[in-house]
Amino acid sequence: MKSAGMLVTFEFPMRPGKESTIPTTAPDAVLFRCPQIADGVRLWEIAKNTDVLDLNSSYAYVLWCRDFATTSIVATVDDRPVGFVTGYRRQDAPNTVMVWQVAVDADQRGKRIAGRMLHALLDRLAPEGVDRLETTISPDNTASIALFTGVARDRNTSITKQELFSPNDFPDSHEAEDLYTIG
């Protein structure tokens, strides 16, 4: 791991996520659940359509839905996946969920689904001792920075940032990735 030595910290005491004010009985209600193998194709489509995420193979999304279902979440409207968070627990830090990707269908953006998925995932994992979230974000991805900073603020907890990967760490052209830690 390479580090520029820069560490930025914002402090908020940890608390559970805010309750949703959107009724769950509306026809377009967003429901959250663990992904299933059958969701893998749809997750791949959502990721592909973002035009921003590093697209993994369709196999990777199907496998993720099988092997990391308990640390991931799918948002559905009328039983159709419209968003997802893929994550895993770090073996060397079992109290930490590492969020790999967050994506929401274009027609569902602006409804705070991404933030609500992250809150739902953290709330689901808290009884198992997960009290930290990590993710990597490229320095120019202001939307993701705002998303994760907002989640930390909503949960009244800290968020830190430090360089994790430089462009030289990748075999192809790839931006630097900063590590953000919530909790």
Where are these regions (language model features)?
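Conserved acetyl-CoA-binding loop-helix of GNAT-fold acetyltransferases
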Residues: 104, 110-124, 146, 150
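C-terminal "cap" of GNAT-fold acetyltransferases
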Residues: 155-183
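Conserved GNAT acetyl-CoA-binding A-motif
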Residues: 125-139
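N-terminal amphipathic/basic-hydrophobic helices that include classical n-h-c signal peptides
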Residues: 1-18
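A short beta-loop-alpha structural element at the N-terminal edge
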Residues: 29-43
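Acetyl-CoA-dependent GNAT
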Residues: 38, 45-96, 100, 105, ...
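Conserved active-site alpha-helix within GNAT-family acetyltransferase domains
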Residues: 115, 139-161
